[in-house]
Regions:
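A short, Lys/Arg-rich alpha-helix, primarily the initiator
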Residues: 1-19
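Short, charged recognition helix plus adjacent turn
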Residues: 9-13, 62-68
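The alpha-helix within a helix-turn-helix
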Residues: 11, 22, 50
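Short alpha-helical DNA-recognition segment
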Residues: 15-33
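Helix-turn-helix DNA-binding elements, focusing on the entry/boundary residues of the two helices
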Residues: 18, 43-46
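Hydrophobic micro-packing sites on short alpha-helices
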Residues: 45-50, 60-61
Length: 68
């Protein structure tokens, strides 16, 4: 199972809001909704977030052994 809770902490540490992701960085509300609900997103989305936040995938998601 995907857990995007590290993303919200990283965004807070970098001073970037979800609103800014939508307005300034062209993220769709659907993508943010998927992240909020711990659903799958594309590797491209993970890459874009890593480049934007200057971080690694470990800073935005963790994978657990819990069933989806």
């Amino acid at each position: 199972m995907y857990d995007y809770s590290p993303l919200w902490k990283t965004l807070d540490e970098k001073g970037i809001t979800q609103y800014q992701l939508i307005k300034d960085y062209n993220f769709s509300t659907g993508t943010l909704d998927a992240l909020r609900q711990n659903r799958s997103v594309t590797v491209k989305t993970i890459e874009t977030l890593c480049l934007l936040l200057n971080c690694t995938p470990n800073d935005i998601l963790k994978i657990t052994n819990e069933p989806i």
